[in-house]
Amino acid sequence: MEPAGERFPEQRQVLILLLLLEVTLAGWEPRRYSVMEETERGSFVANLANDLGLGVGELAERGARVVSEDNEQGLQLDLQTGQLILNEKLDREKLCGPTEPCIMHFQVLLKKPLEVIRAELLVTDINDHSPEFPEREITLKIPETSSLGTVFPLKKARDLDVGSNNVQNYNISPNSHFHVSTRTRGDGRKYPELVLDTELDREEQAELRLTLTAVDGGSPPRSGTVQILILVLDANDNAPEFAQALYEVQVPENSPVGSLVVKVSARDLDTGTNGEISYSLYYSSEEINKPFELSSLSGEIRLIKKLDFETMSSYDLDIEASDGGGLSGKCSVSVKVLDVNDNFPELSISSLTSPIPENSPETEVALFRIRDRDSGENGKMICSIQDDVPFKLKPSVENFYRLVTEGALDRETRAEYNITITITDLGTPRLKTQHNITVLVSDVNDNAPAFTQTSYTLFVRENNSPALHIGSVSATDRDSGTNAQVTYSLLPPQDPHLPLASLVSINTDNGHLFALRSLDYEALQAFEFHVGATDRGSPALSSEALVRVLVLDANDNSPFVLYPLQNGSAPCTELVPRAAEPGYVVTKVVAVDGDSGQNAWLSYQLLKATEPGLFGVWAHNGEVRTARLLSERDVAKHRLVVLVKDNGEPPRSATATLQVLLVDGFSQPYLPLPEAAPAQAQADSLTVYLVVALASVSSLFLFSVLLFVAVRLCRRSRAASVGRYSVPEGPFPGHRVDVSGTGTLSQSYQYEVCLTGGSESNDFKFLKPIFPNIVSQDSRRKSEFLE
């Protein structure tokens, strides 16, 4: 319980002011219906569909329900016909007791939109109970000296029916001394009084027996009887007389058992036994008498049972004081029960919707009614929910409330809400009731799948096996159920020339990517595409991510020697003057490698030589140089084998064979002579050949210059279509050579006289210029560089 002085925070609180509600609804008259009690179950009461102006189908569509006080199911609404029928046989006396009229309050609830229609069912009384006296016989002691017209109160009969069906009249069997007078109390109840018509004489007749009959006003009337035994006494001049004819007292309903309610007091002027007074409850129903106990000696009335204001708010007791001589007096005690705040507020749920979709603002979650059985301030209530939930309360009529969502919910943020509805009355001390409602939030497909990365980079080494798993993409969906089930797909590539469908595939369930065929770094070094992730919601949502596939180079290409030409014909002969200094550049071996990175780093070394130590090869650039001074003792013809090796793992290599001819000077070169020719013939032939060669070289030199200019201009337009071999990235190691064409032969064009040692005709062969920077990416194009 909360203290009386507690201030309520300004939260979602709705103050239920009953008086204000009554004023608001004062002009809203409820619909009234009536039915007789004891009507059989299933009987027709009214056609609600017609009364409300609704079609029969609308009642079912709007979820029509009948809600009565205390959730009693006395009425039932047939949604198919719109008829209101009895769900059970009604007993007016059980429902309302002596209260008249007997009205059952109920409401008709309609949804979409919410509408509460108040209605009342009047249960009319039928005459199904006969009057009953509390005792079978009433004994009266009347002094023989009683004067004519003396009135003697009689115990009244009890009839559970009300109105005209209750007791309307009393009569007595014919006799010569008494008649019965029927009186009406302020509350409308009738009671009998016996009136003395003629004097009594004890000596003549000591006792009389009469029959008192109570008759109700029903049709047909019912009656009940009791025997009256009149004992004629000797004279007792004074009857007991109460100090007050009416005692009015107020008792709080929480008074403890045994507490004093009131003390009545009467006096008798007689003496002896005629003056001894005893008190008794004259007549009241068992329901009225049950909470009280009257002391016959002291007149004290005490509680023997706790009172309940909500069950019965007042009691009327009739007290009789009798003396020893048979005379008696009567008074009334009116006990008004004062209400205290002893009832906690009550809440009853009429409808509850759970789960609710997450994207549905202003959705009705629950419809409930509150009440407090106390009265006044004790019955006023405050209804609220906690602040940290996106819900609010909307008051309706007849203490009904709607719990609705305050805005759109987000299941991904919170999927379940525990809402505590707190009802606090304004009594002292304040009492409160809390009711917990669990609301589940159902998922709506409002979240698209999200990839764990906006882009993925995958590395695949070339020459892979088909169906190789090269990587995975992953996306998650914050929704649940089928809305969170993600399927993956390949999106059409932006490059229309990329054959994506033949390169990779994706597992639609888990996002695994597979290479469909073996990749070739030299043909395709990298490609990119987009993958999509789509959920199974309705409508489906999707997202995409970029995937880059980088093909890693493998050392699958051997070095290719561009110069000297290795085409299976006799190797060209390099001419070296014998006067050449050490370090003289004889020629340069030019080679390329189709791989990239360190797989394309080339190194050169002299593998074989006719005379070791005479020539050397620079490992960096493939230049063949003289290692020392030449002498006359050195043979004229030398054969060199140069090894070109890359830096791959395992390394690949190629060889180049060089023929070197030592001559005394370019004007009189030494030529290898055929072994079978005579010396004179060789000398004559050599002279002729040299003359022809010099003339030819001069002419061809001019022609070659012109041809070179034309070829350069022509090949510039074709340079874009000619592939280039990859060159290594980063710092180039000291012992490797870059084959990008920056060597000594890259900017020069050599025209050399090649002599075939085995030819008797000693023909000259002319080599066209070599362009080492323009290379081919396949074996077919490699041959095009040497015409």
Curated annotation (Swiss-Prot):
**Protein's GO biological process:** cell adhesion; homophilic cell adhesion via plasma membrane adhesion molecules; nervous system development
| Regions of this protein lying in the Extracellular compartment | 27-690
Domain of life, per the record?
Answer: Eukaryota
Gene3D superfamilies documented for this protein = Cadherins
Q: List the SUPFAM superfamilies.
A: Cadherin-like
What is the membrane topology here? Single-pass type I membrane protein
- Quote the subcellular location field of this record: Cell membrane
Q: Which residues are glycosylated?
A: N418, N436, N567
Annotated Cadherin domain ranges read 35-133, 138-242, 247-347, 352-451, 456-561, 568-671
Q: Where is the signal peptide?
A: 1-26
**One example GO MF annotation:** calcium ion binding
Cytoplasmic topology ranges: 712-787
Keywords for the protein's UniProt record, in alphabetical order: Calcium, Cell adhesion, Cell membrane, Glycoprotein, Membrane, Repeat, Signal, Transmembrane, Transmembrane helix
Q: Membrane-spanning residues where?
A: 691-711
Give GO cellular component annotations, separated by semicolons. Answer: photoreceptor connecting cilium; plasma membrane
Tell me, in a sentence or two, what this protein's role is: Potential calcium-dependent cell-adhesion protein. May be involved in the establishment and maintenance of specific neuronal connections in the brain.
PANTHER family per record: CADHERIN-87A, PROTOCADHERIN BETA-15
Stated name of the protein: Protocadherin beta-15
Q: Organism, per UniProt?
A: Pan troglodytes (Chimpanzee)
Q: What is the lineage of its organism?
A: Eukaryota, Metazoa, Chordata, Craniata, Vertebrata
Q: Gene of origin? A: PCDHB15
